[in-house]
A protein has these predicted regions:
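Surface-exposed patches in mature extracellular/periplasmic domains of secreted proteins
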Residues: 154-159, 180-186, 284-285, 370-372, ...
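Post-kinase regulatory C-tail/linker adjacent to protein kinase catalytic domains
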Residues: 186-198, 408-418
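Short Cys/His-rich "knuckle" micro-motifs
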Residues: 107-108, 294-296
Length: 419
């Protein structure tokens, strides 16, 4: 099994994913120390360090060169300014790392005290986005979360950042996500596709070797790694054009009604109310019949937690068995609390189209499933109009939005100094 995470990570080094490596090792009864070390060598070569980020060679190719820019990564990376004012670089460490962690591991110095915990970027999963379920968010989706914050959580809004600062932070979040997902898939590939007694994820000593056998092995390692990375980056590129357009219904949406069509809206709300508690929509199972969150569904956990608990056969409530995993980076599992829709605090936005997409696509990483959309009432599921009826009902029971808080670019508590 992989050893415990060190108390500190060497200056400028990303923290290895000890948690995932240990979970994989426990699940398959294998030792992943060498693959984890090999993975760090390749990650450093391709993605650089916390203070000096780099882009893998793949990003020089035409179809990928616009996804991330090194200049943006350099603005976000590195040590923060020594004053409360934002500097020319170090934006991520100054604004985000105290919660999300320097490596995007979701475990910054203040993370354990929060509920819900800050997002862990290394899975490559984002809950609030406008793209279909299988896609990544667009950059605008990430920027929108930064500008608006997440109501009902400790995620603040950063609505005073300049366009350049926002672009830098968004690029860096995507960078951390790609890097983290690449690390996970390298480890997964080592566990399930390699003979660890004979093969290595990456042999840095083979680089530049003139020995034919070493050269052959190195080329094979590079080919495998490039294939894995390309698969990850392709989804990000494809996601930029994946946002679907939906036609508005022929009845009014809550907040847009007029005296002439108000009765149509009331009819839609009533239909939405009935659908809300129906078996087809099943909203009430989690959100309760009144929408206040008191459903009958048993406590559940997000996919980040399940990744190192239920997926490897450990209950999230079995603290004794979880201690070795928590020592390697896991935070004590928190059961999810279904949204109290009556409060009107909608993470990810409360615009009708945003709520429609959330119902249609579900929330990736959370138990909320995608709707089963059908074309006729003869089929089991929800029709397009039903989704809009649900939107109208939810908006009708929700408290009005709170006034936006004007804020400067918020500065989180400073991180502890490196040893």
């Amino acid at each position: 099994m992989v050893g415990c995470a060190p108390t500190t990570t060497p200056a400028s080094k990303f923290e290895p994913n000890y948690l995932y490596a240990h979970a994989l090792g426990k699940l398959e009864d294998m030792v992943l120390d060498q693959p984890l070390d090999d993975t760090q060598d390749l990650l450093t070569e391709w993605f650089g360090t916390l203070d000096k980020p780099a882009l893998p060679p793949l990003f020089a190719e035409d179809e990928y060169k616009d996804l991330l820019t090194l200049s943006n990564l350099e603005k976000a990376a590195g040590p923060p300014a020594k004053t409360a004012e934002l500097g020319e670089n170090g934006l991520y460490r100054q604004l985000c790392a105290s919660c999300h962690g320097e490596s995007g591991q979701g475990r910054g110095p203040v993370a354990a005290s929060q509920n819900p915990y800050p997002r862990e970027f290394r899975h490559g999963i984002f809950k609030y986005k406008n793209t279909p379920r299988k896609y990544k968010p667009t950059k605008e989706d990430i920027a929108k979360t930064l500008r608006r914050g997440l109501s009902g959580s400790q995620m603040p809004l950063f609505n005073k950042l300049t366009l350049e600062q926002m672009d830098a932070l968004v690029d860096y979040v995507v960078f951390l996500s790609i890097r983290g997902e690449f690390e996970r898939k390298l480890l997964y590939n080592a566990a399930y596709e390699m003979d660890l007694e004979k093969d290595r994820v990456y042999s840095v000593s083979f680089k530049g070797s003139q020995d034919s056998e070493s050269k052959k092995k190195y080329e094979s390692q590079m080919e495998s790694a490039e294939e894995i990375l390309t698969g990850i980056v392709d989804v990000w590129v494809e996601s930029a054009d994946s946002v679907e357009k939906f036609e508005m219904p022929d009845f009014p949406i809550y907040g847009t009604e007029t005296d002439e069509n108000r009765n149509q809206l009331l009819e839609s709300i009533e239909k939405g109310k009935k659908l809300f508690v129906s078996e087809e929509a099943a909203c009430a199972k989690c959100h309760g019949a009144s929408g206040s969150g008191g459903g009958t569904q048993l406590p559940d956990y997000d996919d980040w937690t399940k990744d190192w608990t239920t997926k490897i056969g450990i209950k999230p409530t079995d603290t004794d068995l979880l201690l070795p995993l928590m020592a390697r980076g896991g935070l004590k599992p928190q059961p999810l609390v279904p949204r109290n829709l009556v409060e009107g605090k909608f993470r990810g936005g409360r615009e009708p189209l945003e709520l429609y997409r959330r119902i249609r696509y579900g929330i990736v990483g959370a138990p909320m499933p995608a709707a089963t959309v059908v074309k006729s009432s003869d089929e089991k599921g929800l029709q397009e109009a039903d989704l809009w009826h649900l939107v109208n009902y939810v908006l009708s029971i929700a408290a009005p939005p709170e006034a936006a808080i004007e804020t400067k670019a918020l500065v989180a508590s400073p991180l502890p100094k490196r040893p």
